[in-house]
């Protein structure tokens, strides 16, 4: 393991797919664009295209020069195909467990034993492929409270893996917006409007911008926004207030009504039928604890 391999693992975990054949395996990584333009009206696609040069420098020593890059209006895709016996393929399959699509993958236990620098590199790979920061990502409507969002569609356990790895490098999660009925429709507003499945959305891990500087991005427009919004945050908020894990501060518990979606078949077995009044209750139940 090295930081380059860790970064590649992170990109695959964040938004990748592994297609394994009898002799060869193809890895595809998608870098989607939430918006076509940055907050200061710069073309996101141009920034990502420029960033691919740096990403190639990290990945190509592992995969060779057969890295293919394709771009559409809303995403950039990186892909490569290697023999099943190649080191990079064997390592990816060893370090990524349970699935071949990012929606079902898990981090292997070995990844929690790598060095801090490697963990940071892995988390940066995740952030480059599925994280973003925009002016609208502000907490509580509070001036300067900018946050990075890491979006995880469907994969409940990856949320916990990422949160625990962030904890390992001393980066607190500010909150998790779970794709769960108790949080996405906690007052049954949408349910009562005839939209019973409104809550079925991606999970969002939210981290204060200044805390995420430890991780950073290799995607240029994301890194520029991170630095800008971190500076703005620190003009309004004491960094001691952002550097707190949920178990280090009072947790607001709001008694929520029972939602019929709590028994939905799409929920993992261990939480199906359970009710949660706080995001921290669900996070702790699934394994994000002190």
Predicted segments with their positions:
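Internal intein/HINT superfamily modules and their associated LAGLIDADG
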Residues: 1-290
